[in-house]
Amino acid sequence: MSQPSRPSLAEISSALEQLADRINRTEDDSLEPFVSHSMRAVVNALEYHIPGLEAAPDLEAARGLLRGAERALERGQEREALSRALRGLAFAPHDPSLWYMAGSACFELGQVEDALRLLCHTLWIHPGHRAARADLEALSAFFEGDEGERAA
C-alpha cells in the first residue's frame, strides 16, 4: 500500500500566497469559511515538515512582510495584517513570528478558533515563544472562566 502524498513546502508556500490574495480580494468583516479551512489544512500539512530542515525560500522578504503586518495591525487593518503575514509565510513557512502575527490578526478579526489554532502552531514551531504562550494562556483562562459561569 503506498503512502498518501503530502504537499511539499513549495506547494504549501503557494497555498499561503493564494490565501493572502483571497483575503485581499474580499472585504467582509469576518473570514470566509474557505480561508479558515485552508489555514487549518496548511497548518496540518506543515506539521509533516521539520522546522529548520529546509531553508526558507526568502527570509529577507518574510521579515519585510512581518514588519508590514505589524504596522497594519497597529493601524487597525486586520485583514491587511493577516494577508501580509500569510504572504510572508509563503517566503518562510516555519517562521513563528509570522504565525503569531497571523494568529493576532485572526483574533482581532473575531476568528478566535483560528487564532487559537495559529497560536498553538506558533508554539509547535517555537515552544519558547513568550508572546504566543501568554496569549494562549490568557485565552484559555478566559474560556475556562466562561465555561465555569455557564455551569453555575
Mark where each language-model region is.
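Long, contiguous interaction/recruitment modules in multidomain scaffold/adaptor proteins
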Residues: M1-D58, A152
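Alpha-helical adaptor scaffolds
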Residues: E54-E108, H121
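Alpha-helical linker/edge segments of TPR/alpha-solenoid repeat scaffolds
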Residues: V112-R117, A141-A152
